Amino acid sequence: MSNQYQEEGCSERPECKSKSPTLLSSYCIDSILGRRSPCKMRLLGAAQSLPAPLASRADQEKAMQGSPKSSSAPFEAELHLPPKLRRLYGPGGGRLLQGAAAAAAAAAAAAAAATATGTAGPRGEVPPPPPPAARPGERQDSAGAVAAAAAAAAWDTLKISQAPQVSISRSKSYRENGAPFVPPPPALDELSGPGGVAHPEERLSAASGPGSAPAAGGGTGAEDDEEELLEDEEDEEEEEELLEDDDEELLEDDARALLKEPRRCSVATTGTVAAAAAAAAAAVATEGGELSPKEELLLHPEDAEGKDGEDSVCLSAGSDSEEGLLKRKQRRYRTTFTSYQLEELERAFQKTHYPDVFTREELAMRLDLTEARVQVWFQNRRAKWRKREKAGAQTHPPGLPFPGPLSATHPLSPYLDASPFPPHHPALDSAWTAAAAAAAAAFPSLPPPPGSASLPPSGAPLGLSTFLGAAVFRHPAFISPAFGRLFSTMAPLTSASTAAALLRQPTPAVEGAVASGALADPATAAADRRASSIAALRLKAKEHAAQLTQLNILPGTSTGKEVC
């Protein structure tokens, strides 16, 4: 594991990235040919021994194969593999026919020898000049770097064939970046050539045979290869766990992508970590005899990708549908109220249109309902009441008075004497009449009219201040806990004291009317008295504001105000 992490760390360090792609490509070639990586060779102090194995391998394979350049062309034309399979099915992987592997190795060795002597590359390219001087941190000498650069040019055709697919989900794109698409096994059988192994089992046995260890090792011992394979498998298991975490925790995808970005870049650039992990999974499978699910995912990721992509899409689409089904199942049916419940609720609505939470809870306990249902009933009841109000305002033209208990003979009766209550609200009507009578009694100089409303005598001149004093101060904006301070600041209005007396006096005058209404509980009598008087004032003020707006006396913005 330590060597594996040293390789990745070296490929991720900025000085390694800033050198050039030649070192990275040499890293690819050395790993594909089965030798130790340049980082390990530098750590072991054997950086100067690179050209000797290259030359020895070149001589051996020239003796075996003849002309190396003639064999490199068909190999390049045949082998279009992603980086993950280059070690499985590439040269030295033991998965192709031994002749094909030797031909591939001969092609790479010939490229290295040609660049070492200064000739052109495999595709007729002029190799780049070697680096000037090797620093102590260099992974190999200049001749090795130039050889690797020219040999990497032979693999450019492989890189062209790896266009990224269009990903459906982010988790699928992560898996595609980490483990590229693997062609199905029949296509791999065709790649092995006319004399290739026919079945995957035979190919596995050929890979685990005694002759595959030197081919995969490429000059190193079989024990070193076993250690490398075990380390690679552990590293790949960690990557698989990270991928599973990505699939399970989609909310953390962005953060995980940022954390994995340099690591994924190094894997995509070198192409050896994934390839070594795939080879490790194959080797463990040949030793153990059967594949674990994670290793099957490594060898056949196209099946897993198809399933994973479909599952992720179905889950993302199905989660919404499942939530929708749950919501549909949990849909609340309409509450059916009994006649007793409706009677009690209507009685409470007569007392106040806006009951507080304590009143609602008490009603809910008495009527065997929930507080939420009581609140919704009051909302609906208020909406119905507003609708009736609008319908009543449209049926009466603005100049004619509303039908009410008070006399309509006075000119201001449409504004002060109108009663918004339907006939089944006697308690509130009587409360408002009693309040008006009490306010009139507070001013003996102003004799009350026959309807006992607080109005100046008909012979007195009706100024605008008198009208506004009666109407504006009964608007909902002025019915607030601070109305006493407000009245004290508005002395120029002649009827301000009249309105203040009207708002101060109703509680003692209303006691008889409210007590006569069907209230059996004496504990809530005071609260109900206050609620009924405030409700009466609110309703009267709302209707006065509507009337004044129709006559363009007050601005239109004050029509829809309600005090909650």
Swiss-Prot record:
Q: Which GO terms describe its biological process?
A: axon guidance; cell proliferation in forebrain; cerebral cortex GABAergic interneuron migration; cerebral cortex tangential migration; embryonic olfactory bulb interneuron precursor migration; epithelial cell fate commitment; forebrain development; globus pallidus development
Keyword check for Transcription, yes or no: yes
Where located? Nucleus
Residue ranges: DNA binding: 330-389
GO CC annotations on file: nucleus
- The superkingdom of the source organism is Eukaryota
Q: Provide ranges: composition bias, Low complexity.
A: 111-124, 143-154, 205-215
Acidic residues bias: where?
A: 222-252
Q: Where in this protein does the record put region Disordered?
A: 1-21, 54-79, 111-264
- Known Pfam families for this protein? Homeodomain, OAR
Tell me which InterPro entries the record gives. Answer: HD, Homeobox_CS, Homeodomain-like_sf, OAR_dom, Paired_Homeobox_TFs
In chain numbering, where does the motif OAR fall?
532-545
Show the ranges annotated as biased composition (Basic and acidic residues): 253-264
Family, similarity comment: Belongs to the paired homeobox family. Bicoid subfamily.
Name of this protein:
Homeobox protein ARX
Source organism per entry reads: Mus musculus
